[in-house]
Design a protein with these regions (language model features):
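Short glycine/proline-centered loop/turn elements that form peptide/ligand docking sites
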Residues: 77, 81, 102-106, 123-128
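Short aromatic/hydrophobic contact patches that present stacked aromatics
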Residues: 64-66, 96-98, 134-136
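Conserved GNAT acetyl-CoA-binding A-motif
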Residues: 88-98
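Residue-level recognition of the GNAT/N-acetyltransferase active site
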Residues: 68, 72, 98-102, 127
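Acetyl-CoA-dependent GNAT
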Residues: 3-70, 78-87, 138-146
Length: 147
């Protein structure tokens, strides 16, 4: 992700999430040394989807995965998640994320990539209030008893 993507990603955030990241938040994230963002683009250069990852030591937290409604069911989210999982396999003990309990397609995608439910956060989401399912994927690394 670079500055040229910010406006389109902010629009995608507004379309996909009830509490979206603003252009200012996305711009600030560009300069966060612990954050990495990847973008899937169409042949014309439009943003089809994006994903964000925060890394602290050997722990990864997937902040966001969003895909344009017209691009869904075409493997965009699958590819974005695959990039972070390959990074995790090489560099992390685990990846974790939260997902709305009602978001069955996303939960199925995460399970396909080896994530398992690790817990729930009651009323984590607003607009509407809903529980978050915490999902984690552990990687086989020396000293990682979960992998």
């Amino acid at each position: 992700m670079d500055r040229s993507h910010i406006e389109q990603i902010a629009a995608l955030e507004r379309e996909c999430f009830s509490t979206p990241w603003s252009e200012a938040m996305l711009t600030e994230a560009l300069f966060d040394s612990q954050a990495s963002f990847i973008v899937a683009e169409s042949e014309e250069g439009g943003v089809l989807g994006y994903a964000g990852l925060q890394v602290v030591l050997d722990e990864g937290y997937i902040d966001n995965i969003a895909v344009e409604p017209n691009a869904r069911r075409h493997g965009v989210a699958d590819e974005l998640l695959d990039v972070f999982c390959r990074f995790g396999e090489a560099n992390l003990a685990f990846l974790t994320l939260e997902v709305r309990a009602s978001n069955a397609p996303a939960i199925a995608l995460y399970r396909k990539h080896g994530f398992e439910e690790a817990g729930r956060r009651k009323n984590y989401y607003t607009k509407p209030a809903e529980d978050a399912v915490i999902m984690t994927r552990y990687f086989k690394r020396i000293g990682n008893e979960h992998g």
